[in-house]
Amino acid sequence: MTDKNTSEQLWTGRFTEATDAFVEQFSASEHFDRRLYRQDIAGSMAHARMLAEVGVLTAEERDRIVDGLTRIREEIEHGQFQWSPKLEDVHMNIEKRLTDLIGEAGKKLHTGRSRNDQVATDIRLWLREAIDGILDELLRLQAGLVELAELEADTIMPGFTHMQVAQPVTFGHHLLAWYEMLVRDQGRLEDCRKRLNQMPLGCAALAGTSFPIDREQTCSELGFDRPTRNSLDSVSDRDFAIEFNAAAALVMTHLSRMAEEVILWASPHFGFIDLPDRFCTGSSIMPQKKNPDVAELVRGKTARVHGNLNALLVLMKGQPLAYNRDNQEDKEPLFDTADTLRDALTAFADMLPAMEVQREACYRAARAGFATATDLADYLVRKGVPFRDAHEIVGRAVRYASDEGRDLSELELDELQQFSGTISEDVFEVLTLEGSVAARNHLGGTAPAQVRARVAEARDRLRLLMGK
């Protein structure tokens, strides 16, 4: 009988038989959590330096650990690291390799910590970096929309409610509506980043540690705002992952709405835009097809992000304090959401500013649905007609024009006057599309002057955020 651990696993002292081979495969996570290796190594280096400061490690042991971890990072980056599912996860794979490289000092690294606080720290570090990358792409998309909005500040298109022509708007105004969605998304992601930037390291398994650790030191080295305040909560909390996924689900919802409009606009029935060939695909059977696959995929991938949010919520809803192995299942949906969101933003940041707006088609569509009917009602109100009466009068005029196959602006003055004697020659000034959009010249309105003012504000804001 020997007390020497001959297994690859680093926790077998209490066990009398080897882990079942299927259970090893079933419970291993190294095939997906290995992408945390940089964060895991950074956390271990900070932990080793802190242990040396408080006298748990010698300076020589600290240096050997840091050097060994540096070598392991290089091995992983160069594809030379041998991952083993028998070691379960990224943490044990790295620790085992460290011990193989430097000997006994490697076995001391885990003093004063657990995989519970270790993985919680790793995920926060990883997600913090992922959010930064996502925000970069989000800002790039915002900037592209703002530039296109300026180009299309005077372009008139139909605005829709219930997918029916409602009132004329400018294309630039519509693009700035997308921009406003993304500004809110940015704020949610930034708030999420602030809340996740607290360090669990040092909370150990669930109760803390009896070693004289200095959590403020590791917190500072790893760039966290502060250490967490309760060890039980720290190792079991996945709020930050859920919050990120909720924010991501909203971003994807907005991108999906944009995608739906792009798909409609690119169809021959609308013809509002032409997408560059590089963002489209063809058909294996129909030679004429130019399919907006990028937009369709963004719309489709929204479903998986929504599904990931639900998976995380359901994962956490029944767990008692503190850490449970269920939490291993947090990483794949989290990784997938971050990857999917960043890819979708990259695709749209490249594609949407490259849309070629078909201005004449937009204008024709705006004229086709009596889009200036509200302007005629407003005209009557300014002439002293109560709004409800004006609404009724214009409704009858629209029905007449529809039966005649003409727009309101194409009716003769005497035809309009049969519906209200208050109508005079000046009515035609308000029945043009140009007059309609120009009249909405107030903060938030669709007038070209307002679009340009909002573009200037947005450009100043983005210049500060992007350093350009």
Curated annotation (Swiss-Prot):
* One cellular-component annotation, GO: cytosol
One Pfam family per UniProt:
Lyase_1
The record's catalysed reaction(s) read: 2-(N(omega)-L-arginino)succinate = fumarate + L-arginine
Q: Which domain of life is it from?
A: Bacteria
Its pathway is: Amino-acid biosynthesis; L-arginine biosynthesis; L-arginine from L-ornithine and carbamoyl phosphate: step 3/3
Q: What biological-process terms (Gene Ontology) are attached?
A: arginine biosynthetic process via ornithine; L-arginine biosynthetic process
Descriptive protein name: Argininosuccinate lyase
Q: What is the lineage of its organism?
A: Bacteria, Pseudomonadati, Pseudomonadota, Gammaproteobacteria, Chromatiales
